Amino acid sequence: MHEAAAQLEPPRLPELFCGMARVRGPRPVLYPVSCSPQAWASGAMFMFLQAALGLLPQASEHMLHVREPQLPPFLNELTVERLAVGDSRVTLQFRRQGSRTLANLLGVEGGPLQVRIELS
């Protein structure tokens, strides 16, 4: 994903991937009807981060699970500030340590929130 985003100008994710095998070349093959930014894809990076960081919010239960986070290879540290979970805002720090990604709860604002961090 990072390699694909870095090849486009301005840097961004492609609107779609067609499923053909990857071939060597200077950049991904452009597909004119899909290579213009479209609003439906604007949330792709947030969904990517949610999956990579293992964020599973349960707002009605006042709970946030962080399950086996994994930072991508190009990123050694990431801080997520004031992430909304129901009426609460949570700040988390993720840091690579060897092959593992560690998660640290830095703070909770607003309503009550239980944060469960499960590392592999």
Feature-to-residue mapping (PLM):
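Non-catalytic C-terminal accessory modules of carbohydrate-active enzymes
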Residues: 1-120
